[in-house]
């Protein structure tokens, strides 16, 4: 049964990730596929992009010498179902859990939205949710791209530095990430928050 998620962009994030709707095109013209992704067929996908985003997508596609080599999505979903949410959580937990030492005991965490995806990820990772005595507080802003925490910016950067540098889903080098404006990469604030809990200094 479909359900609403805490933020519209988070909902689109899950929908687009599971719809394989993203393509990264390097400045050299090389197309890199992420999350098992395929280029979005704009005429069939449910979320609308602005004229500016459509123009950027068109320019990037035109820069690729063999456009026929870019597979197109067969279609999308109109809603976010429980199965898609579960698949997002499964995949993200699998990737993030490999970042941490198995002996590391996560610090109790407080989160602003106890029903959100971040809470689901933390629970699956064995992180105790403790609103009263938490050593770390996390909040994902409504646009789904910004993580706020009780740690300083420098501590966050230090904790996530290697994880961000080695994550296969983060494009490297100059290029253009072609996407629906609602698409959030798998290095979004939700997965970043979960990774921070496992990697932050105790």
What is the predicted function of each stretch?
Residues 16, 124, 199-202:
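Active-site catalytic microenvironments for nucleophilic, acid-base chemistry
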Residues 135-202:
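Phosphate-binding and adjacent anionic-ligand microenvironments
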Residues 1-42, 134-135, 142-143:
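Ferredoxin-reductase
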Residues 2-5, 113, 155:
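Short beta->alpha linker loops
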Residues 33-136, 142, 146-152, 163:
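Gly/Ser/Thr-enriched, mixed-charge loops and adjacent short helices
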Residues 7-11, 31-33, 116-117, 146-148, ...:
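Short glycine/serine/threonine-rich phosphate/pyrophosphate-binding segments
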Residues 11-14, 26, 46, 98-99, ...:
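A generic local secondary-structure boundary/capping motif
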